[in-house]
Amino acid sequence: MPIPRQRRRCAGFTILEMSVVLVVIALIIGAVSVGRDVYRSAVAERISTDFVQGWIIAYDRYTSQVGAVPNDSPSNPTGRINGGTGNALCDDDLRDEMLRRGIALPQGRAEGFENRYVYQDANGSPQQLRVCLLNVNDWSEPSTGSSYAPRPRNVMRFEGLTAELAHQIDLRIDGRIDARFGRFREDSRYDDTSPIGSPPADNPWSESEPTPSSYNREENIPTMVGYLKMNR
């Protein structure tokens, strides 16, 4: 008499097994996200240390060796970049003026593009940081009492700042994130002479870092312009 075969029962994944798989996937995604954030933070730190600080050092060496600010007259100095014309000193003009005085430049995007630096934003898209020098007539400085007044100052302009990079540089230079006060300011806030409220209001940069859970990675991350007040 033939013995009937027992059919093996086909069973799917149990709830516990599926839960374990989902947890593992979530951990992998989280690790990748954290790794990406750590990498961008390290890149921003490198930009602050090598590129931004490198240009500050180059500027200070220029003024120390020449006895005047860039593209000003050493024999009849005005104390203002480009002689106070209001025009920015950028790109080839900036590079040539520095090299003509024997000033070593920081490594930038490439040879001949030392005033530019390419980096990736939170979307992985390329952004370009660009440095120029100029004189402004309306840098806000403390005046009598609790008022503020516009003063002429030489500044270094940084174009192409994402919120993440602007915050990193602001923290490194001023020790806090503040778009209005300190040496490093946003171009739309540097000349604000309105009185401080009580209690003082926060002064965030106009763009904030994107929220990972809500922003669209297909969108372009906006950039800003920052002004750094020079020592001379």
List the predicted regions and their residue ranges:
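Membrane-proximal N-terminal amphipathic helix
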Residues: 37-70
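N-terminal single-pass transmembrane signal-anchor helix
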Residues: 2, 7-40
